[in-house]
Amino acid sequence: MAASTVWTILKGAGLDPAPRRSGPTWGQFLSAQADAILAVDFAHVDTVLLRRLYVLVVVEHGRRRVHLAGITAHPTGAWVTQQARNLLMELGDRADRFRFLIRDRDSMFAPPFDAVFAGADIRVIQTPGRAPRANAVAERFIGALRRECLDHLLIIGPRHLAAVLREYVRHYNGHRPHRSLDQRPPASGTPARSGAVVRPLRRDRLGGLIHEYVQVA
């Protein structure tokens, strides 16, 4: 990403670039602040009845934990703002650890949406136009969701989509390994002790579309 793009993003968020014009790159900023960053984005899903549904997802940069914020056929600024309130309620005391929220320039992210996060001392950073890589963590999740799940299923309607996404997000957070987390899932607990006698157990999800493997004594 060009230095001028990084400068625009940081300046728009009220973060003054270093006077010597050699401050951190966008990637360095994301790495340094990962545990304090949320990213939000929309995915769309077309049903077998040719109806388009919109999915609002939020990703915690540090742990790669995903939150399914909401599903609707008619996204509006008011709806998106309510999902922001719901997310902060879901996070509870954990919301205090976040300082930044990255979003694109979608018109659904209206000033009231930003105000919800501002009220929680979370600064909204708006990415430049036509720069999807600026919100790469959220984009990567949406890409994985399509490749691993949605591209293989025919979605009937909102209730069906909600059930599918809930199961996939449970798998993603609880079992899917991530390279940035040393091949552990976002919600991983304490790893098994070295030398313990264990055997793998396979669990099928989404009708066998996805396989999970757990260790049992």
PLM ranges: what are they?
Residues 1-217:
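Charged DNA-binding/catalytic regions of mobile-element recombinases
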